UniProtKB/Swiss-Prot annotation:
Name this protein carries in UniProt: Catalase
Native organism taxonomy: Eukaryota, Viridiplantae, Streptophyta, Embryophyta, Tracheophyta
EC code(s) of this entry: 1.11.1.6
Organism: Pisum sativum (Garden pea)
Reactions catalysed: 2 H2O2 = O2 + 2 H2O
CDD domains the record matches: catalase_clade_1
Length: 494
């Protein structure tokens, strides 16, 4: 008997009600009782099973990116980059690969409004012939801190106060003044783009620096950029209040309704590349996740397009159980020494094992669509049917073999063990440059948001903390620092 043929699914439904084990249920409305008024009998197994299943419906919420929406579609290569990478799904223009994408807010809970000022997650899973590839990013090109050691504390500071369960400004300001590299990220978060209009009208970025390797073994650093063909649109404060007040799931609804109506969202994929031999030529560290690569000296190169043309069939199966991890790579794409990326490689998979179990990659939405083979087996919720006798390697009785060798970066490393910051700091220049590109009204809105944050009357936002933030923004842009100090009745200092 085929163990998969009769697996419970909507495609193999019974015409009548059953228990989980398949026994017929003749009454799904009434408990088994002594007489018509009770008490209820414990022997009513269907009642016990129904309640027990209900009690366990919820799984642990993602510690970040809890609120999200997913959609399916395809990625198509439009420009040849085979000279940069040997990744099979990027081998030639015209090649299409199925994808599933999850958009999300970052900090707030699963049921929170989608109009809050918060970064947005932008994660893409490619189902390729060489296995799955996860490109896990955000709608901003940079991050708050450049060392993953600080990530748990950063999330704690952004999350609600553990005593009151309220997100509070003083905690955010108190934590991040210790990390001036966060200024660049705040130039995005407190900008108009801090509240996207919806998921269709926002950029996506791989954020971290990765590595591309071609067939000859030549490697380059790479940054990934998704650009929506319908443009970037944002909600200002009054608009966010109005939209969020009428529908706290507006972005999820917009995504679903647009696809259902045939108005398919589309993004163009671009890359930037740097030869690792030239990484010391820049005034920033290319592996610093708090910095962007200036497009005037490192131009965008077109790669392909992504179209989302199918809604998910089940929210739990294809959104809540959908799991991403930057460690899931393919031949031709590799990690870099980006400190934040290095910690994400471990933390994401570890989080999914906690949330979904050790066999989370067997769930249909996470499983590869191509054949695979290894000796990772058993454990909680194992769903793979195996009938082989040999579960070790190597063996003369098993024909499975090693795959062909694939190129990986061959950088030679020699240094002392150290715990230290990235040597090239330069925390303020890019934040200031970004601010100066805006129109005056956009600058004024940015200033107003910072004045509001620093004017919070909580006594834990001390004069010292305000002074530090004014100093930081003064170093980014002198006029911005002066305006901020003036609104706060303070003296600007650098």
């Amino acid at each position: 008997m085929d163990p998969y043929k009769h697996r419970p699914s909507s495609a193999f439904n019974s015409p009548f009600w059953t228990t989980n084990s398949g026994a017929p249920v003749w009454n799904n409305n009434s408990s088994l009782t002594v007489g018509s008024r009770g008490p209820i009998l414990l022997e009513d197994y269907h009642l016990v099973e129904k309640l027990a299943q209900f009690d366990r419906e919820r799984i642990p919420e993602r510690v970040v990116h809890a609120r999200g929406a997913s959609a399916k579609g395809f990625f198509e290569v439009t420009h040849d980059i085979s000279h940069l990478t040997c990744a099979d799904f990027l081998r030639a223009p015209g090649v299409q690969t199925p994808v599933i994408v999850r958009f999300s807010t970052v900090i707030h809970e699963r049921g929170s409004p989608e109009t809050l000022r918060d970064p947005r997650g932008f994660a893409v899973k490619f189902y390729t012939r060489e296995g799955n590839y996860d490109l896990v990013g955000n709608n901003f090109p940079v991050f708050f801190v450049h060392d993953g050691m600080n990530f748990p504390d950063m999330v704690h500071a952004l999350k609600p106060n553990p005593q009151t369960h309220i997100q509070e400004n003083w905690r955010i300001l108190d934590f991040f003044y210790n990390f001036p590299e966060s200024l660049h990220m705040f130039s995005f978060l407190f900008d108009d783009v801090g509240v996207p209009q919806d998921y269709r009208h926002m950029d996506g970025f791989g954020v971290n620096t990765y590595t591309l390797i071609n067939k000859a073994g030549k490697s380059v650093y790479v940054k990934f950029h998704w650009k929506p063909t319908c443009g970037v649109k944002c909600l200002l404060e009054e608009e966010a209040i109005q939209v969020g007040g009428s529908n706290h799931s507006h972005a999820t609804k917009d995504l679903y309704d647009s696809i259902a109506a045939g108005n398919y969202p589309e993004w163009k994929l671009y890359i930037q590349t740097i030869d690792p031999a030239h990484e010391d030529r820049f005034e920033f560290d290319p592996l610093d996740v708090t910095k962007t690569w200036p497009e005037d000296i490192i131009p965008l190169q077109p790669v392909g397009r992504m179209v989302l043309n199918k809604n998910i069939d089940n929210f739990f199966a294809e959104n809540e159980q959908l799991a991403f991890c930057p460690a899931i790579m393919l031949p031709g794409i590799y990690y870099s020494d980006d400190k934040m990326l290095q910690t994400r490689v471990f933390s994401y998979a570890d989080s999914q094992r906690h949330r979904l179990g050790p066999n989370y990659l067997q769930l249909p939405v996470n499983a590869p669509k191509w054949s695979h083979h290894n000796n990772h087996h058993e454990g909680f919720m194992n769903a793979i049917h195996r009938d082989e006798e040999v579960n070790y390697f190597p063996s003369r009785h098993d024909t499975v073999r090693h795959a062909e060798r694939v190129p990986i970066p061959t950088t030679h490393l020699s240094a002392r063990r150290e715990k230290c910051n990235i040597p090239k700091q330069n925390h303020f220049k890019q934040a200031g440059e970004r601010y100066r590109t805006w129109a005056p009204d956009r600058q004024e809105r940015f200033l107003r948001r910072w004045v509001e944050a620093l004017s919070d009357t909580d006594p834990r936002i001390t004069h010292e903390i305000r002074s530090i933030w004014v100093s930081y923004w003064s170093q980014a842009d002198r006029s911005l620092g002066q305006k901020l100090a003036s609104h706060l009745n303070m003296r600007p200092s650098i």
